[in-house]
């Protein structure tokens, strides 16, 4: 897994509990995914070790270089609409 310098030097320093394995799993099997206006991609997944809280992993536009990761307390799983 590729990471940015910002992720290695800032994110992991601020949130040392974040495991790279969690990020890899979320990228491989996201619960949800969204492309931001700037081209970066948000991936969400649920982490048992965080009490099944949602973890947001943001990658660069390539979809594989991790730039940010943090617990996302505002994440709402997508709901299906019935027409």
Question: Whereabouts are the PLM-identified features?
Answer:
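Ribonuclease/tRNase effector modules and their secretory precursors
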Residues: 1-83
């Amino acid at each position: 897994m590729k990471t940015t310098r910002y992720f290695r030097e800032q994110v992991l320093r601020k949130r040392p509990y974040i495991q790279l394995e969690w990020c890899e799993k979320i990228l491989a099997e996201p619960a949800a995914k969204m492309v931001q206006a700037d081209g970066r991609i948000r991936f969400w997944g649920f982490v048992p070790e965080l009490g099944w809280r949602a973890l947001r992993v943001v990658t660069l536009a390539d979809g594989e270089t991790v730039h940010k990761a943090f617990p996302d307390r505002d994440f709402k799983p997508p709901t299906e609409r019935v027409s």
